[in-house]
Amino acid sequence: MNSKKKRRGQMSEAFCTAMFLSLSGGLQDVYTYLFRGKVFANAQTGNIVLMAVHAFAGEWGRVLHYLVPLCFFALGVFAAELMHQKLQNLQRLHWRQLVVLCEIAMLFVVGFFPQEWNLMANALVSFACAMQVQTFRKVNGYAFASTMCIGNMRSGMDSLCSWVLNRNPAALKKSFYYWGIILLFALGAGLGSLTLDLCGAKAIWFSCLLLAVSFCLMFLKEDVEEIKEDLEALEAKH
């Protein structure tokens, strides 16, 4: 038996983890837009545009409707990076898993909020989305975003163009990764719209379930490596 160790990437960057993160990201965005007052949880460019429109119309109450989620999104990025810097040497849990646990907790609480609390609900969902986009920035070594599509679309088309010009199989594979993530995001949004019809405010809990799967998947690499080390130790004795 060959005991040579193979180099493995982080499970937090594996496509299967990104798959559930992207499904969750699409669901979060449709949840706040359709159920929480036409606010985007992830697409802050859209929120800035709508905020500017209402500001120039003198509708200051509506400005606040978009400004608060924007501010909480910024705070979410700050919080995720702070956790990265302070908790990156943890042994039992990866710091990214702690971020996912924080996301799950916040989104679970949002499921109890009535629509009169939409401002706070949107703030918490935006905070959670920002933590996710700051924490999970690569899939199989490629830069990506699990909560928005414009960067993925640009990178996907860039890689596709590279393949058309050079017939480089790696470029085509890279393009497939990006378009796969975009399709999963769209699928999450579509499924989210269906769960809203069935569950209302509690539809966000389906996002919690998807994040929980991602959390569990991040244990997988550690388990595999421990098994490999045990096998190698056994071979050494013989």
Q: Language-model segments: which ranges?
A:
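Short, Lys/Arg-rich, polar N-terminal cytosolic tail immediately upstream
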Residues: 1-12
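Small-residue-rich hydrophobic segments that form or flank transmembrane alpha-helices
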Residues: 14-62, 132-173
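Central cavity-lining transmembrane alpha-helices of secondary-active solute carriers
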Residues: 67-82
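Hydrophobic/small/kink-forming positions within alpha-helical transmembrane segments
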Residues: 74-78, 182-190
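Helix-to-loop junctions at the C-terminal end of transmembrane segments
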Residues: 78-91, 191, 196-197
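Cytoplasmic-side transmembrane-helix entry/capping segments in multi-pass membrane proteins
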Residues: 92-101, 121-124, 145-149
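Symmetry-related core transmembrane helices of the 12-TM Major Facilitator Superfamily/SLC fold
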Residues: 98-105, 202-219
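C-terminal ends and interior cores of transmembrane alpha-helices
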Residues: 104-117, 218-222
